[in-house]
Design a protein with these regions (language model features):
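Phosphate/adenylate-binding glycine loop and adjacent helical scaffold
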Residues: 338-341, 345-409, 413-416
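Carbohydrate-active enzyme catalytic cores, enriched for enzymes
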Residues: 50-55, 94, 205-212, 217-348
Length: 490
């Protein structure tokens, strides 16, 4: 039974996520009768308890609630496509199926917005909804706010793309959907988006690549969806040509990557299919969460966005401390390096050391996901200080304390009981310097690892001479210089 439920939810995911693009396409005047028919029939069948394709009753923390958001936004913005054509029975069934989100517990995170959007949609078509749970969800979202536009994703302490493509994105949707009924919050969410934009722009390099950091990177070009939401909401935290440039360059960069399979279907991975870095909640339809960036298609033909020139990156600071994002960002020669403090919940979704606790994340270098902790090269601890103990590799999982300064990041951490490390990362004109103070109760080997250079790339070579190690290919080069100063115990 459980396997069948998971299969149904995987299919629902692949059905609902394209709506993030199709609904704006319809709102903007696009027409595709075949797709309209597919979605009307699908909604009717999936929400009919008597139909063999019924999506089923939901439970606690159900993945179905994630997929309800796209359907709810469709009802809010294109009811003539997804609501009005349904029979009276079909409308009752759809409302009842969506309403299940009010009868169960959902995670204390960005999922609160799914309940908010569903209740707004039900209210908009005169169906039963919960004003109490709507307000409760909004209060929880407000409680996540940290500062400078950043929020936590609920109880999770890490800051990642779930802030721009979830918390901020849905907040901007709410600011339009609820402008008349909740003007105070609508204005507040727009103000926070203004602040956030001044920070988030630092995550994009001059070529259009965005920072590879955090979980759910298989959503790929959803990286630019925050800018799309700003433009759709009529908000200009940056000049419109600058935001268009960010979006266009990011899309162009992604179109240059190997993200499609032979049939033109988005794969799970990042720049190419890669299952090591996949999340446990990923299914074949997961990458289509990136369709949220196509909110731009809802803009009318005469919107200034379509005629604006795509402007280059604005003038930005060389070093940008982001204390509310737990990182220091460096801009150098058009590229971005983020020095992360290693702040994360330390468990939950898996591979958090790789996705949050490396010392540096860079738009020109991808980061590695570990295959095994028993062999150094399979542990792939790029941009980490790796300790080998009893033939096992240990790295930073999470920092105990940290400090973000104007020119450095300092963190205290422990890879293994009996080993305490204080690491200070200082950006320089040509890269960065790492200073590690290690207090170990026993002998062990430690490897300070640089960025990952693909050894299958043209021109790859590596060398080690005295205290200098280098790896390079035709397009990337990483050089590491090692200085040691032993301080034996008294």
């Amino acid at each position: 039974r459980r396997q069948r439920q998971m299969c149904i939810r995987d299919r629902l995911e692949a059905f609902s996520r394209p709506l993030w693009a199709l609904v704006p396409f319809w709102v903007g005047g696009g027409s595709d009768p075949e797709f309209e028919k597919i979605y009307r029939k699908g909604l009717a069948a999936g929400t009919d308890p008597e139909n063999p394709e019924y999506w089923g009753t939901t439970g606690e923390y159900d993945q179905c609630y994630v997929e309800m958001a796209a359907i709810a936004c469709g009802i809010l913005t294109a009811p003539e496509k997804l609501w009005t054509p349904l029979s009276d029975t079909g409308k009752q069934n759809l409302a009842a199926w969506l309403g299940q989100i009010n009868a169960h517990t959902i995670p204390d995170c960005n999922w609160q917005f799914f309940r908010i959007l569903v209740n707004l949609a039900l209210k908009s078509v005169g169906m039963p909804y919960s004003s109490e749970l709507l307000e409760d969800g909004l209060c929880k979202i407000d409680s996540y706010y940290s500062g400078d536009g950043w929020s936590t994703d609920g109880a999770s302490v890490q800051k990642d793309y779930y802030i721009p493509w979830a918390i901020q994105y849905y907040g901007l949707l709410y600011s339009k959907f609820a402008a008349d009924i909740d003007p105070r919050r609508a204005a507040l969410y727009r103000q926070r988006a203004q602040l956030f934009a001044q920070q988030f722009v630092y995550w994009f390099d001059a070529d259009g690549a965005a920072l590879p950091f955090g979980r759910s990177l298989t959503y790929r070009f959803a990286q630019n969806s925050f800018w799309a939401a700003c433009i759709w909401a009529g908000l200009e935290p940056l000049p419109l040509p600058v935001m268009k440039g960010l979006i266009v360059r990011n899309f162009n960069w992604w179109l240059g990557q190997k993200m499609f399979d032979r049939d033109g279907i988005l794969t799970i991975g990042y720049c190419y299919p890669q299952m090591y870095m996949a999340e446990r909640y990923n299914a074949p339809g997961s990458p289509y969460w990136g369709m949220k960036s196509f909110l731009l298609l809802a803009l009318p033909d005469d919107h200034p966005f379509w005629s604006a020139e795509a402007a280059p990156m604005p003038a930005l600071e060389r070093l940008k401390p982001m204390p509310y994002a737990n990182m220091l960002v460096q801009r150098r020669a058009g590229r971005i390096t983020a020095y992360a403090a290693g702040v994360n919940e330390g468990h939950g979704h898996g591979q958090f050391p790789e996705k949050y606790a490396k010392f540096a994340y860079d738009t020109r270098f991808g980061f590695c996901a570990s295959r095994s902790r028993e062999v150094l090269n399979q542990a792939a601890p790029d941009s980490m200080l790796a300790f080998v103990i009893d033939d096992n590799v240990f790295v930073r999982k999470v920092s105990k304390t940290w400090e973000i300064e104007a020119g450095a990041v300092t963190a205290q951490w422990s890879p293994f009981p009996g080993i305490e490390v204080t690491t200070t990362i200082t950006p320089t004109a040509t890269g960065h310097r790492r200073h590690h103070e290690i207090d170990s109760s026993f002998d062990c080997e430690a490897y300070d690892c640089g960025f990952a250079v693909p050894n299958f790339a043209p021109g790859y070579a590596e060398s080690v001479e005295n205290d200098t190690a280098e790896a390079h290919c035709d397009t990337l080069r990483c050089t590491c210089l090692l200085y040691t100063s032993p301080s034996p115990r008294d």
